[in-house]
Amino acid sequence: MKQSSDHLSDVLAICRAERAVTARFFLSAPWALASEGVPGTMIRIGQGQPYWLQVRGQAPVQVMPGDLVLLPLGSPHVMASDLALPPISFSQMIERFAQGPKDENPLTFEHGGSGASSRIDSVLLWISAHCRHTILPLLPPLLHIPAQQASPPAILGHVLQTLIEDSLERRPGWRLAAMRLGELAMVHVLSNYFAAQQEREQGWVRGLADAQIATALAAIHGNPSHDWTLQTLAREAAMSRSRFAEKFKALVGASPMAYLLQQRMAHAAQQLESGLPLVQVAENCGYESERVFARAFKRWCGLPPRAYQRKSQALRKEFAALK
């Protein structure tokens, strides 16, 4: 069977949207809104008057019409016509305008004064646990893609506007379209970002720049539960075990087996979030003992598997309600 040469796609294939929340804001200067953070990946694109966006602890950026912004982990931020203005909490606006869960009733509102207006389209994605634990933490808290740098900008902007309009008009299939089109926009941004970083970053991003290591990385990401050994991974890379282990650690920053363990635990987190019983998750991840798996999982994320499962269920409810 012919192997893929597009290893970045192989790795990013785990980044799937499981739910989507959409919104459209009509904002007239002066205005300022503050978010304390949301449990998801936020994508926004605006039209009309430029506005400012500042992630907590970061320098502000001016967002021009057609620019795309992505907050991979939904970090706390302020967006405003003027950052000197005292912001109103997003949660207050949601309480005021939302009607039921937002994934059932997309949010739209008008806010501000009588000055120049901006329209901001927004989609919030609940991304698969495997991606949230392994891919998204590698990103900066804000990715800002100017309209002239998007490739191609017109199509990407049209995709986002289409998914917002479908959801606001409740067209048949809008929920699935919102998930898939939002996912498409996110993967487009991630692929461009990571492709530009391959020579600078350590970790799997840098590993993808090397054809042999990239093959092994794609194999791990594609099937983390497989009974991989150092020998079988070296064989995937067409290298000797010693040379493979040395080169993998130099590029990725972790040994092949340590990296494999990280991917398995992230894969386990995704299965726990789907509601699978602990014993089944342990077996799927190659553990004969539920107790041994539970210890390994707790070392990885700081929570026992059942506590993680309860927390993820609570976050899903928060994502849907956003109250």
Residue ranges and their predicted role:
Residues 215-222, 226-234, 239-240, 246-295, ...:
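Terminal helix-turn-helix DNA-binding modules in bacterial transcription factors
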Residues 1-68, 74-112:
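Generic protein-terminus/edge-of-domain signal
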Residues 49, 82, 166-169, 192, ...:
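Generic structural signal for alpha-helix termini and adjacent loop/cap motifs
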Residues 143-154, 167-226, 230-237, 250-258, ...:
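Short, Lys/Arg-enriched, Trp-marked, Pro/Gly-tolerant hinge/linker segments that flank
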Residues 8-14, 76-162, 195-196:
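A hydrophobic/aromatic-rich effector-binding and dimerization subdomain
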Residues 18, 42-45, 155, 159, ...:
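Amphipathic, well-ordered alpha-helical segments in soluble domains
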Residues 17-20, 51, 168, 194, ...:
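Generic structural signal for secondary-structure transition and capping sites
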